[in-house]
From Swiss-Prot:
It is found in: Cytoplasm. Belongs to the RecX family. The keyword Plastid does not apply. This is Regulatory protein RecX.
Amino acid sequence: MKISQIEKKKHLYLIKLDNGDNLTVTEDTIIRFMLSKHMVIDSQQWEDIKSFAQFSYGKSKALGFIAFQQRSQKQVQDYLLKHQISPDLIPSIIDSLKQGKWIDDQQYVDTYVRQNSLTGDKGPLLLKQKLMLKGIASQLIEPVLAQTDFSSIAQKTAEKIYQKYQHKLPSKALTDKIIQGLLNKGFSYDLAKGIVSQLSLEQDSQHIEGLLDQEFDKLLRKYSRRYDGYQLKQKLYQALYRKGYDSDDITTKLNDYF
């Protein structure tokens, strides 16, 4: 067999043989086999060229995928499968990328956790969950999390929640909101409680009274359509208590109204 034509197609090359066969290859394939027009090749060489061309194409796709963003090994594997790279070739492509330090799950964890410490708001439980979803083994994740101080991240996250709800909720509900927000972000309950204890959540009575009045009016409109008398009073009390208002304040408000 003889190469009758080598035609460049963007970043790839189309090789045509005189027997009608053709193959799209990477530049690495051209260089590795020193391919040129009129070159004579036998059937075994052609099979070797095709095999390496698939490997090189897969590796090129992977490098494009990780060029601008660090990826985990599983992310790269999934990407290659999605782009119809042969599953038989993927392990060798991954090994080549690992040897070249293009993918390194331990480095991925280190960078991910460090970036969260600088600009993120996630606690260790959520970080671990997200990293494991990227296919990273827990034994690579846990030592890094254990060495990371999450108190400042939790403090910053708690303050953001406080700023958002301080004028909308009474102190008890505000405390619960901050703790739940921290738990949702993956911080431990003990750390969440400790952070909240450091915040100044006291509110003046006039502010609380204003919040209670607003909530009372809203709930009254809702429940007065279906209830009256004692039953209405009970529904209002229960709803206001669930929203974090003090029992004595609720009772006073209800007695004033009824």
